[in-house]
Each structure stands twice: as structure tokens, then as C-alpha cells.
Amino acid sequence: MSVYSLPPAPPTDEHQLFQRAEALSGFTLGELASKAGWNIPADLKRIKGWVGMLLEFYLGASAGSKPEQDFADIGIELKTIPISAQGKPLETTFVCVAPLTGNSGITWESSHVRHKLARVLWVPVEGERQIPLAQRRVGAPLLWSPNEEEEELLRRDWEELMDLIVLGKVETITARHGEVLQLRPKAANSRALTEAIGEHGQPIMTLPRGFYLKKTFTGPMLARHFLL
């Protein structure tokens, strides 16, 4: 397997990043982990982000989970997406942590969600549970930016969810809110609380929340680009 020296320097442009991602297509996670000298976990229960970290290593990402994009110098976010044998997404896609305080004056145009989704390198990975992690293959990459219709759907959901947060209704929001974007708790344990605004404007402690893309958004997007 000849990929390149590891870990590579951050990519200098979109074309170089896409070429690197294309070079990984068809390899199993076991092959990539072995080449990188990484231990492969038995499953992803305790280390959900492992696949993304492995691919970031190969692609030369720098941001980790900081607010900027994974490839901040060229303005691109990496999103791995587990897919079924039919090419359909198997789970929702984490976008970023939701701000629960200090939101006066925030707009869709200046939001982290819009920033993170402005330009995305999607890398599908086999995700069906009966396939052992080491045997799951990496799929063909896709460079994507939301079209007008997609951006409008995202903006509408984001504004509705942020209105509820600002009005002190964060604890009334369920995963069913939003057509394509949902807000739900993001915490490894229920003791990791963060400050938010309550219904009467008072500070409250609640679970951190994250924005996630629903499968009803990523499914049609993948189908359109890969002609499924």
C-alpha cells in the first residue's frame, strides 16, 4: 500500500485533499490502522470518533474538534459517514456544539453550523454492525457545499432551534424538532453539565447540546451525488 509518508503535512489546496481522500478509497480500516501503527478497537462504543481521527491522520488535518474547520487553512470540514450496503447513512452526523448562552445578535451567517458546513469533504465508510471494524472499507469521497435549497432548510431549522434556546426553552427541544437539523444532548455522562438560560431568564445547568444533521438530509445528498 503506497499512500505517502505519515503523517502528511496539511494539504495546500482542495485538489490535494481530495486526491489524498481518493487514495484511501477501497482500503479497510484495519489496513489503514496497521500502516499508521494504530491499535484498532474491537468496536466504537467507547471511542466513537476513532474512524474520523484515523482518516484525519492520513489526510493531514489540524483542527481536532476546535470551532474552526478540520482543514482550516483551506476552509474544509471532514465528515466521515457510516453507510449501509445500499449506500444509506446509518446515523445522524454531528456538526458542532450548540452555544446555550451569549447568543444575543447571533445570525445564521455568523453561526458555527454554517461555517462548519460551508465546504465539507464527506468520506463514506462501511458501517453495518455485522462487519468487523477492521474489515470495513473506506468509500469514495465527495466534496460538497450546500445548494440554495439545502442552505435554506438548514437556516430555517437553525433559527427555530436557536430561538428556543434564547427564549429559555432548551429543555423542551427534542430530536424531533427540525426538518434536517436536530439538537440533542452531547455528553459522555449525565454529570457533565453546562450553563444555559431557563424559561424565566435565570441561569440553569443542563446537558451540553450538539447540532446534528438528520439522515433525511444526508441520505438524499449522498444518493444525488453517487446516483444511488
Curated annotation (Swiss-Prot):
SMART domains: MutH
Principal localisation: cytoplasm
Pfam family, one: MutH
The keyword Cytoplasm appears for this protein: yes
Highest taxon of source: Bacteria
GO cellular component, one term: cytoplasm
Location(s), subcellular: Cytoplasm
Annotated keywords: Cytoplasm, DNA damage, DNA repair, Endonuclease, Hydrolase, Nuclease
One GO-annotated biological process of the protein: mismatch repair
Cited function: Sequence-specific endonuclease that cleaves unmethylated GATC sequences. It is involved in DNA mismatch repair.
NCBIfam families linked to this entry: mutH_TIGR (TIGR02248), PRK05070.1 (NF003458)
Family recorded in the similarity comment: Belongs to the MutH family.
Protein name as catalogued: DNA mismatch repair protein MutH
Native source species: Yersinia enterocolitica serotype O:8 / biotype 1B (strain NCTC 13174 / 8081)
